[in-house]
């Protein structure tokens, strides 16, 4: 109980807290293998794999479809109690993804606040809150997660985006290095970034918790940043009603039709290219079969 109370106190004060070790070496190895399998090829046509929406990261969406351990991680008692204690009982898991950060030396991802709720809707009322759970799948001694302590402590909207915020002195920033399996919670309303330089590729998971009643930003939903949560239903066997609710199983279904704007201008030529590739593959296999029969 003292661990919960102390961690919650730090989280409320600083906006970020490093959690005690929760993942066994065997569990970590399984998670690493499943995650790396998604980095072998890009998601394309019938392939499952990674997506790339910026130059420095290979994104792996829907990690709850990879292995049961990815579902069990956010359900660990300390994590569940901290999330509910910081937010409220209505909160549930809304995103579960990860990415490989490629090596870089520039400040490609400066200090920023996440844009996820609709700023117009909450212009005259208290802003909604969320929490993110980070998990390093590799040892991290460069390109670490950085957070400006206390920058989450405001009730009105802070400026989102990367060009609003100047550099902050190191003594105000929590930088999280650590071994594979390192876990931390943070409020994305606070200023945060991936530090630079990042000297080697590294993999990490991020889970996002917030209430289903929050009105989301269109920039969040229509630029490929927010993916509806998918889960392998076989991983849910044996879970309690409370655990299922925390994974978002009991929330109302969304009626919105996704309208992803990313690469929208290229959708027609990309569709033509994929169909042409499939057609070429069909004729190649047909000709090869005839040649082999001779």
Pin down the residues of each PLM region.
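A structural signal for short, well-ordered beta-strand segments
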Residues: 96-98, 133-135, 205-209
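Non-heme Fe(II)/2-oxoglutarate
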Residues: 190-191, 195-294
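Active-site rim elements
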Residues: 67-72, 169-173, 194
């Amino acid at each position: 109980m003292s661990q919960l109370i102390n961690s919650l106190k730090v989280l409320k004060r600083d906006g970020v807290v490093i959690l005690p070790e929760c993942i066994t070496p065997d569990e970590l190895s399984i998670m690493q293998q499943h995650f790396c399998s998604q980095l072998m090829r890009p998601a394309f046509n019938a392939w499952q794999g990674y997506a790339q929406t910026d130059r420095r990261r290979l994104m792996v969406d829907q990690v709850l479809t990879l292995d049961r351990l990815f579902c069990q991680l956010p359900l660990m008692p300390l994590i569940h109690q901290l999330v509910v204690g910081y937010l409220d009982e209505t909160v549930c898991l809304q995103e579960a993804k990860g990415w490989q950060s490629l090596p870089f030396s520039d400040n490609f991802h400066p200090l920023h606040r996440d844009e996820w709720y609709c700023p117009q809707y909450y212009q005259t009322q208290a802003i909604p809150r969320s929490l993110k759970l980070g998990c390093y799948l590799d040892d991290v001694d460069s390109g670490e997660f950085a957070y400006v302590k206390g920058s989450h402590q405001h009730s009105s909207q802070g400026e989102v985006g990367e060009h609003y915020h100047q550099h902050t002195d190191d003594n105000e920033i929590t930088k999280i290095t650590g071994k594979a399996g390192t876990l931390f919670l943070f409020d994305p309303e606070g200023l945060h970034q991936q530090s630079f330089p990042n000297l080697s590729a590294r993999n990490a998971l991020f889970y996002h918790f917030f209430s289903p009643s929050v009105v989301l930003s269109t920039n969040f939903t229509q630029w490929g940043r927010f993916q509806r949560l998918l889960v392998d239903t076989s991983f849910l066997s044996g879970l309690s009603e409370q655990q299922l609710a925390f994974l978002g199983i009991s929330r109302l279904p969304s009626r919105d039709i996704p309208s992803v704007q990313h690469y929208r201008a290229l959708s027609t030529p990309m569709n033509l290219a994929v169909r042409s590739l499939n057609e070429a593959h069909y004729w190649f296999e047909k000709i090869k079969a005839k040649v082999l029969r001779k």
